[in-house]
C-alpha cells in the first residue's frame, strides 16, 4: 500500500472557514465538502508543499497572513482517479491553522465549488469524514 503525507490548511478569514466541494468523479471523497490540500512531493519541505497546494488548488491570489502547524492524524482511504481507477492509500494528514488576508479564490478542476462558511453553518454541509473529524477536533462541530 502506498503512503502519502498530506498537507491540509484550515483557512479562516473574518470568522469564516473555507470549504471546497470535491469534483464528483475523483479524489478520496468525491462530491463532498472538504478542506483543500494535497500530497507532499519527494524532497519538498512541508510549508513549501502547503503553499504549492494552495496555489494549485485555490489560485495565486489567495494570500495567507499566518500559517501555524496545528495537528496531525492518519487513516487508510480509497482514492478514485479521473479515469475511474481506485487505489487504497495510507494517508498521514498534517493540518495547519491558516489565516487569509483576502478571499480571492480560483479553484482548479479538483473542486466544483467553494464557500466561506460561518462556524455555526459548518454542520449544514455534506462534509467528508476527515473534514468532519478535523472540525470537531477544533471545536467547530
Curated annotation (Swiss-Prot):
Its EC number is 3.6.1.9, 3.6.1.12, 3.6.1.-, 3.6.1.23. Residues 1-141 form the Nudix hydrolase domain. The keyword Calcium does not apply. A motif (Nudix box) lies at residues 38-59. Gene3D superfamilies: Nucleoside Triphosphate Pyrophosphohydrolase (3.90.79.10). Its cofactor is Mg(2+). It holds the Pfam family NUDIX. It comes from the Bacteria. Keywords: Hydrolase, Magnesium. PROSITE patterns: NUDIX, NUDIX_BOX. It catalyses: a ribonucleoside 5'-triphosphate + H2O = a ribonucleoside 5'-phosphate + diphosphate + H(+); a 2'-deoxyribonucleoside 5'-triphosphate + H2O = a 2'-deoxyribonucleoside 5'-phosphate + diphosphate + H(+); dUTP + H2O = dUMP + diphosphate + H(+); dTTP + H2O = dTMP + diphosphate + H(+). GO terms for molecular function: dCTP diphosphatase activity; dTTP diphosphatase activity; dUTP diphosphatase activity; magnesium ion binding. The keyword Lipoprotein does not apply. InterPro entries: Nucleoside_triphosphatase_NudI, Nudix_hydrolase, NUDIX_hydrolase-like_dom_sf, NUDIX_hydrolase_CS, NUDIX_hydrolase_dom. NCBIfam families: PRK15472.1. PANTHER family: GDP-MANNOSE MANNOSYL HYDROLASE, MUTT_NUDIX FAMILY PROTEIN. Belongs to the Nudix hydrolase family. NudI subfamily. Catalyzes the hydrolysis of nucleoside triphosphates, with a preference for pyrimidine deoxynucleoside triphosphates (dUTP, dTTP and dCTP). Monomer. This is Nucleoside triphosphatase NudI.
Amino acid at each position: 500500500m502506498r503512503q502519502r503525507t498530506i498537507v491540509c490548511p484550515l483557512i479562516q478569514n473574518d470568522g469564516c472557514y473555507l470549504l471546497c466541494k470535491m469534483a464528483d468523479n475523483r479524489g478520496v471523497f468525491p462530491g463532498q465538502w472538504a478542506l483543500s490540500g494535497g500530497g507532499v512531493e519527494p524532497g519538498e519541505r512541508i510549508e513549501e508543499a502547503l503553499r504549492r497546494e494552495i496555489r494549485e488548488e485555490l489560485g495565486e491570489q489567495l494570500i495567507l497572513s499566518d500559517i501555524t502547524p496545528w495537528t496531525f492524524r492518519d487513516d487508510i482511504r480509497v482514492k478514485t482517479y479521473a479515469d475511474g481507477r481506485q487505489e487504497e492509500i495510507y494517508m498521514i494528514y498534517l493540518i495547519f491553522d491558516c489565516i487569509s488576508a483576502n478571499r480571492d479564490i480560483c479553484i482548479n478542476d479538483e473542486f466544483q465549488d467553494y464557500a466561506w462558511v460561518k462556524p455555526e453553518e459548518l454542520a449544514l454541509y455534506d462534509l467528508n469524514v476527515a473534514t468532519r473529524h478535523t472540525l470537531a477536533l477544533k471545536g467547530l462541530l
